[in-house]
Amino acid sequence: MQITIKAHIGGDLGVSGLGLGAQGLKGLNSAASSLGSSVDKLSSTIDKLTSALTSMMFGGALAQGLGASSKGLGMSNQLGQSFGNGAQGASNLLSVPKSGGDALSKMFDKALDDLLGHDTVTKLTNQSNQLANSMLNASQMTQGNMNAFGSGVNNALSSILGNGLGQSMSGFSQPSLGAGGLQGLSGAGAFNQLGNAIGMGVGQNAALSALSNVSTHVDGNNRHFVDKEDRGMAKEIGQFMDQYPEIFGKPEYQKDGWSSPKTDDKSWAKALSKPDDDGMTGASMDKFRQAMGMIKSAVAGDTGNTNLNLRGAGGASLGIDAAVVGDKIANMSLGKLANA
């Protein structure tokens, strides 16, 4: 597994402190420890998602074989060892997929929708709630195909989390499937491409789902708030809005009993993530939703959204900056899926 870590020498790693003797070395050691922890966390996220998605793709059919033969149990052991979980982890993972039952399953199903078409997936789901059993045949349930699929998922997630969703998607194309759908796939290369497609699909859909489901509430006549669980993401969006005051202006607030709103002295990032009791006006919340729409378009690759062509006063590209925020939201969303 190859992970690209973007670090700015001096700032991120504390190298600028090397000339300060013991204090500089202490700073470097602390930064190195922090970087190591970040790499471990990143690897854990990738491993958890790879194991879970491989289980969803192959687990339903294999689960039936676990109690039927020692061969089935052996494949369980091999799959667990392949992803660092051992026999115990594999036995837990190889359960019947809960199609649509949890957040990651929904992202998996959506990735299949994008790949096969919603009608096909719905038809197969109606025939059996075990998607893997309906989509793959017995001859495809080999260790080599599972390893290749897992490697493809791993590579896709490593690219998204290391290089950014936008850059990863720019060089990606969906695999071409014949009339046989997934059952027409044969060989490690085909299953590696399938895993890559599922990994990319899950990453993109995780970001889009997060942006589509930001929860808000109203307290009083014109006091709007982002709910606490979404304020981390709202802060990222607010920082994007702060880069373009000529487009989004400043947030406004209006106390109960006031005839008109006033401009807040807070940045968008702070007003959204750390609001006081006044929150922001409905008009300001609409601007937040406008910004979310721009970021969703960037994540989805929607070149038809002309807002992405706008430029700031200094010439900065709104579309590029929206894509950068989309990358951050994809990473945050994948982390949440892995730890759900």
UniProtKB/Swiss-Prot annotation:
Domain of life (superkingdom): Bacteria
InterPro entries reported in the protein's UniProt record: HrpN/Z
Record-linked Pfam families: Harpin (PF04877)
Biased composition (Basic and acidic residues): 262-277
Compartment annotation: Secreted
UniProt keyword Glycosyltransferase, yes or no: no
Keywords recorded for this protein, A-Z: Hypersensitive response elicitation, Secreted
Keyword Cell inner membrane carried by entry: no
Similarity-based family: Belongs to the harpin HrpN family.
Name of the protein this chain belongs to: Harpin HrpN
Organism from which the protein derives: Dickeya chrysanthemi (Pectobacterium chrysanthemi)
